[in-house]
Design a protein with these regions (language model features):
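C-terminal transmembrane helix end/exit motif
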Residues: 1-2, 201-225
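Helix-terminus/linker motif at the lipid-water interface of multi-pass membrane proteins
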Residues: 26, 30-48, 117-124, 180-191
Length: 236
């Protein structure tokens, strides 16, 4: 009769990886809830317009998730082998792919927001609010791909807790700035949908800064590698 043995060390390590990722996903979901709650409290049209506009970001995230999933799978294998050269090449390729995707979505949202909103609605009011949101939020789309690459690299090097902390801090600041800019506070006038977009942009800038800062600390992958010279020259 076979007996089932539990490797407590394995499950403890698995738990330390699972919990930060769960917390990170929960915090990201809270941003959407906060946006809907705050904007919906002012005007249902604000909430509807932003909900439609953020569908574009959802599509972008699908492309970025595919690229970063490949980075995570291959990167974890090479991290286990301590093949730093391969990690260097994979990270450089992921940065390039995510950079191209981010630039394409930025250009589309910054210069053609009205055409994008027409895909989702014909209501002039919703289109106008959506355009106001996308013109500001588009700059955050330019940064998202890069920060996701750095966060994945932190997870690969067994620093999922740090990645979750970066995302959680970013989300909390986003929610606070939402309240400040949407409702108006500390001498700042109410900016409604533009306030939500500005809060998103500032939080994304902070997320990228924190991700880069932590990623190059001793013990993290990026303290050991550098972006390949050919890829760096070929980047946008």
């Amino acid at each position: 009769m076979r007996t089932i043995e539990f490797d407590t060390h394995f499950y403890k390590k698995l738990w330390t990886l699972m919990v930060p990722i769960m917390v990170q996903n929960l915090m990201l979901a809270l941003v959407a809830v906060a946006d809907a709650f705050m904007l919906g409290g002012m005007d249902q049209n604000y909430m509807s317009a932003v909900s439609l506009a953020t569908q574009i970001q959802f599509i972008q995230n699908m492309f970025l998730s595919a690229a970063t999933a490949g980075l995570a799978i291959l990167g974890a294998q090479y991290w286990g082998k301590q093949d730093i050269k391969a990690l260097d090449d994979i990270f450089a390729l992921a940065i390039r792919i995510c950079g191209i995707v981010s630039v394409l979505f930025f250009v589309a949202c910054a210069f053609f927001p009205r055409y994008l909103m027409l895909i989702f609605t014909n209501e002039p009011v919703l289109i106008d609010y959506g355009v106001n949101y996308l013109k500001i939020a588009s700059f955050s789309y330019l940064l998202t791909g890069f920060s996701q690459c750095y966060i994945v690299m932190m997870k690969i090097s067994e620093h999922a807790g740090t990645a979750a902390a970066v995302s959680s801090i970013t989300v909390l600041i986003n929610i606070v700035l939402n309240a400040v800019f949407i409702y108006g506070a500390f001498g700042i006038e109410s900016m409604n949908v533009r306030g939500a977009a500005l809060a998103t942009l500032i939080s994304r800038v902070l997320e990228l800064m924190l991700s880069i800062t932590f990623s190059y600390r001793p013990g993290y992958i990026l303290s050991l590698i550098h972006i390949s010279e050919p890829t760096r020259l070929g980047m946008i």
